[in-house]
């Protein structure tokens, strides 16, 4: 294992509530009901895909022009930016600071594969941006998760073969993307979204480098990786 690639939301910090509040505000303005179940469906997908999902849910997929959709996304991001500006290093999820230190101490490269265009700002607010050797810009990709491109791009930026990478996700689309990239998939959470992961932990505090090493060795044996 030469590199570990992280998703951001739900793995490094939890801004799901901020996404929920920002999307709910927009949905209410266009008379579409929006609840937490709907918000769960948006985990791991891009802003454009999220808006399309909301519009389809509300039967309004043909109601807005592209320019109007751009304005809705701009307003959502403005609300979200205001909310994330309050983040501090205290908002790191439990165990993540420790894991980053362990990875650095063993010279294992660290990458970020997040669909969020706000990822660099969030990492700066959390005071961990300097820990990352590569941060993928999702705006440069043709497809988002579950397409593997974002993880393959991270591996290329780190100059590490995908087969030598582990990646950590909390969403079904992300797990699918990791496996399609040919990487060791670590899922944070439980239930249906974690199906397909090579290792599942209930919460980030369970993540340690020792556990990753142990499960990585078992994975190599199962997959006959030299």
Curated annotation (Swiss-Prot):
Residues that hold beta-D-glucose 6-phosphate according to the record: 9, 44-45, 47, 116-118
Positions of Mg(2+) binding: 7, 9, 170
Enzyme kind, highest EC tier: isomerase
Cofactor(s) it depends on: Mg(2+)
Positions bearing 4-aspartylphosphate: 7
Gene Ontology BP terms: carbohydrate metabolic process
Gene3D superfamilies per UniProt: HAD superfamily/HAD-like (3.40.50.1000), Putative phosphatase, domain 2 (1.10.150.240)
Subcellular location: Cytoplasm
Enzyme Commission numbers on file: 5.4.2.6
Catalytic site positions: 7 (nucleophile), 9 (proton donor/acceptor)
A single Gene Ontology CC term: cytoplasm
Catalytic activity line of the entry: beta-D-glucose 1-phosphate = beta-D-glucose 6-phosphate
UniProt-recorded Gene Ontology molecular function terms: beta-phosphoglucomutase activity; magnesium ion binding
Post-translational modification: Autophosphorylated.
CDD domains: HAD_BPGM (cd02598)
Keywords associated with the record: Carbohydrate metabolism, Cytoplasm, Isomerase, Magnesium, Metal-binding, Phosphoprotein
Cofactor, how bound (note): Binds 1 magnesium ion per subunit.
UniProt KW Transport keyword: no
Tagged with keyword Isomerase: yes
Function: Catalyzes the interconversion of D-glucose 1-phosphate (G1P) and D-glucose 6-phosphate (G6P), forming beta-D-glucose 1,6-(bis)phosphate (beta-G16P) as an intermediate.
Subunit-level organization: Homodimer.
Family membership: Belongs to the HAD-like hydrolase superfamily. CbbY/CbbZ/Gph/YieH family.
Further details from the record: The catalysis proceeds via a phosphoenzyme formed by reaction of an active-site nucleophile with the cofactor glucose 1,6-diphosphate (G1,6-diP). The phosphorylated mutase binds either G1P or G6P and transfers the phosphoryl group to the C(6)OH or C(1)OH, respectively.
NCBIfam families, A to Z: bPGM, HAD-SF-IA-v3, PGMB-YQAB-SF
Record protein name field: Beta-phosphoglucomutase
Native organism: Bacillus subtilis (strain 168)
Gene: yvdM
């Amino acid at each position: 294992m030469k590199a570990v690639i992280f998703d951001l939301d739900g793995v490094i910090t939890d801004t799901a509530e901020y996404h929920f509040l920002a999307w709910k505000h927009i949905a209410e303005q266009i008379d579409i009901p929006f609840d937490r179940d709907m918000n769960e469906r948006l985990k791991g997908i891009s802003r454009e895909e999220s808006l399309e999902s909301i519009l389809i849910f509300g039967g309004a997929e043909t109601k807005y022009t592209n320019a109007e959709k751009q304005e809705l996304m701009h307003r959502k991001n403005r609300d979200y930016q205001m909310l994330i500006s309050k983040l501090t290093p205290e908002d790191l999820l439990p165990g993540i600071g420790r894991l980053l230190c362990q990875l650095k101490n063993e010279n294992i490269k660290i990458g970020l594969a997040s669909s969020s265009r706000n990822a660099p700002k969030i990492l700066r607010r959390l005071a961990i941006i300097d820990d990352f050797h590569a941060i993928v810009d999702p705006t440069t990709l043709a497809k988002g998760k579950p397409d593997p491109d974002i993880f393959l791009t991270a591996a290329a930026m780190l100059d590490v073969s995908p087969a030598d990478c582990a990646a950590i996700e909390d969403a079904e689309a992300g797990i699918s993307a990791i496996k399609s990239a040919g990487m060791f998939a670590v899922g944070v959470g439980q239930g249906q979204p974690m199906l397909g992961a090579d290792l599942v932990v209930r919460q980030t505090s369970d993540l340690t480098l020792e556990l990753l090493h142990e499960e990585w060795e078992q994975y190599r044996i199962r997959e006959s990786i030299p």
